[in-house]
Amino acid sequence: MSYVAVYSIATPDTPNKVLTHADDIQSTLADHGVRFERWQPSPLEKGATDAQMIAAYQAQIKALGYAAVEVVRVTQDHPQKDELRAQFLDERTYSEDEVRFFIAGQGLFTLHIGDYVYSLRCEKNDLLIIPAGVPHWFDMGENPHCVTLRLFNTAQGSVPSLTGNEIATRFPGLDD
C-alpha cells in the first residue's frame, strides 16, 4: 500500500501524520508542487522487455510531455544492488523534474521540504513527479524489487547534485 509519512526534521522517529488514501497523499504533496497519482495498469507479460514496457504506457508517457524514457530494474539478485542503494540514499536535487512510474515492486522516496520530511512509499502503478530543485533521496530496501519508468526532459537524462546533507541517515528507510 502506498503511503506518505510526514515528519518534522526535529522528530525523525515519530511521524506527525501518516496518510494512506491516494486523495490525501495527492493533496498533501500537491501543496509542495509534487505530483502523485495512480495509473491504470497496462497488461504486461512476465519477462516483458524494456521496449514492451515503454510501449504499454506510451499514451501516458506522451501525455506527460517528457522527451526520453528509460526502464530501471533493480532486484535482489542485481550484482550492484548494495552500491546502488547506498548511492541513492544520498540527498540530492536535480535541475529538472524527477519522474518515476512504478511498473512493479516498491521504493521509498523521501522529500526534504523546509522543516519537514515526506516519506512516500511508492508501489506498482504509482506515478511520482518531484519538481526540479526539491532535495530528496530514494531507498529501494535491502532486498530490492522495483521496476520503474524514468522520464527525462532530454535524451541525455539528468545528473544529480548531491547536497552533502546527511539527513537521510536520521529517518526510517523502506525496511524500517
Locations of the language-model features?
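N-terminal leader/capping segments at the start of a protein or of a new domain
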Residues: M1-Y66
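Structural signal for conserved beta-strand scaffold positions within catalytic alpha/beta enzyme cores
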Residues: R38, E70-R73, R150
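Conserved short histidine dyad/triad with adjacent acidic residue
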Residues: V71-S95
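Short, conserved beta-strand element in jelly-roll/cupin
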Residues: R92-I113
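A short secondary-structure junction signal
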Residues: L111-G114, S119-R121, M140-G141, P160-L162
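Conserved metal-binding segment of the jelly-roll/cupin
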Residues: C122-E142
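Double-stranded beta-helix
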Residues: D139-D176
